[in-house]
Amino acid sequence: MEMNSLYIDGKAVDATSGETFVSINPANGEPIATLGQASSADVENAIESAKRGFAVWSAMTAVERSRILLKAVEILRARNNDLANLEVVDTGKPLQEAIEVDVASGADVIEYFAGLAPTLQGDQQPLSDTQFFYTRREPLGICAGIGAWNYPIQIAMWKSAPALAAGNAMIFKPSEETPLTALKLAEIFTEAGLPDGVFNVVQGDYRVGQMLTAHPDIAKVSFTGETGTGKAVMSDSAKTLKSVTMELGGKSPMIIFDDAKLDDAVSASMVANFYTQGEVCTNGTRVYVHESIYNDFIDQLKTRTEKLIIGNPMDMETQIGALISKEHLSKVLEAIELAKQSGATLLTGGYQVTDNGLANGNFVIPTVFTDCHDDMPHVQQEIFGPVMSVLKFTDEDDVIRRANDTQYGLAAGVFTQNLSRAHRVIHQMQAGICWVNTWGDSPAEMPVGGYKLSGVGRENGPETLLHYTQTKSILIELGDYASPYA
């Protein structure tokens, strides 16, 4: 596939660094496209373009901006299948997921913030008969979005939607593992009427990200990725006092009580570990099951997990796709071997799939370990693959303590038919995204983000729009100025 690498000032352009990288199809190891790494000059061009675009975009009324964003939503939905197919080739995830979720959920978020944009307003308060003040919610300026490789186009839309709705410009850097669909999103924004420069795309590795996080003309950075990189991004951003949003890693607990609907609990645990072949930051990889239903749970879990279809992601029957890269495949397989050595019981899975034409891809069979303990490496560390750890519990207070005993705090879930217990337990979970009797839903209206080392700030929901604004206070004197000097 031939394509320009960058999108700057309303058009696709080539990078000028002379360096290139190759996007690889995770399902077969074949190259998809060769792209150019952005140079410092390219990044400067993107920033200068964004300044010009911001001047035009921020001067528009919120209703005018909303109309353009809604037009982009219309185009995105019309091209859902084409975009989903490209996303599958780039990520290795099953087409049945991408065609239903990835583009659609991102378009929903743009639509949500387009509708919310005209509600941005300030306050007014009288101070005396002759004096009052009012406030304005003003855009920050140029924002940087740095995406991850598991949901490339969805993340690009989640980050650009509130930024653009509030009147900002955005420079977006997708992961170098999945660079393709962000360029398509930029084209669609332009087609919808977005002024040139308001959404630019630069490509490359961590060096390009560092150019953005260090640049004094970038007002805010929104980053999705692993916690170690997030710390570095936040540190770089602090040098110029940038606002930051960080959506980072997790090792989330799911607690299944003895009165839970067993079928639902098993279904949710499978979704929470095997959807997108386990490459989801909110995965509920620590599944705590009450001792009285433990055997029934793992019996059903084993039977149903072994029926999952792993194969060519482009086949609509496929439920488990390919991991993003050979390097990541090796990390997941290493984590599985450590789990075996730790004393956990391998219930099912535990190996790379190489038959049925999958030998050149990065396929790992859905894997479940039982008889796990909290101090085992695979229970403590984020694996980001299709690996579930099942642990027993008997006491409510004890399982709450165990569930919270982690450096992460992204998500948590509780399964019970006791409404009082559901609220009591979920209120004690140290996590930013919590579910009761379900897992994984993330509607545009709901703020999402982490506690502890899982992040800073929120994405989606009404408060996120405010994160892309700054408050200006204006005091008005209607009478004579009272000078303290004669």
Curated annotation (Swiss-Prot):
PTM annotation (Cysteine sulfenic acid (-SOH)): residues: C281
Catalytic activity, EC: 1.2.1.8
Cofactor: K(+)
Residues that hold NAD(+) according to the record: G147, A148, W149, K173, P174, S175, E176, E226, T227, G228, T229, G249, C281, E382
Keywords: Metal-binding, NAD, NADP, Oxidation, Oxidoreductase, Potassium
Catalytic activity: betaine aldehyde + NAD(+) + H2O = glycine betaine + NADH + 2 H(+)
Domain of life: Bacteria
Residues that hold K(+) 2 according to the record: L241, K452, G455
GO molecular function: betaine-aldehyde dehydrogenase (NAD+) activity; metal ion binding
Cofactor note: Binds 2 potassium ions per subunit.
Positions contributing to K(+) 1 binding: S23, I24, D90
Cross-referenced InterPro entries: Ald_DH/histidinol_DH (IPR016161), Ald_DH_C (IPR016163), Ald_DH_CS_CYS (IPR016160), Ald_DH_CS_GLU (IPR029510), Ald_DH_N (IPR016162), Aldehyde_DH_dom (IPR015590), BADH (IPR011264)
One biological process term in Gene Ontology: glycine betaine biosynthetic process from choline
A UniProt-annotated Pfam family: Aldedh
PROSITE patterns: ALDEHYDE_DEHYDR_CYS, ALDEHYDE_DEHYDR_GLU
Record-annotated active site: K159, E247, C281, E459
Class of the enzyme per the UniProt entry, highest EC level: oxidoreductase
Pathway(s) of this molecule: Amine and polyamine biosynthesis; betaine biosynthesis via choline pathway; betaine from betaine aldehyde: step 1/1
SUPFAM superfamilies per the UniProt record, alphabetical: ALDH-like
Family to which the UniProt record says this protein belongs: Belongs to the aldehyde dehydrogenase family.
Subunit: Dimer of dimers.
General function of this protein: Involved in the biosynthesis of the osmoprotectant glycine betaine. Catalyzes the irreversible oxidation of betaine aldehyde to the corresponding acid.
PANTHER family named in the record: ALDEHYDE DEHYDROGENASE-RELATED
Name of protein: Betaine aldehyde dehydrogenase
Gene giving rise to this polypeptide: betB
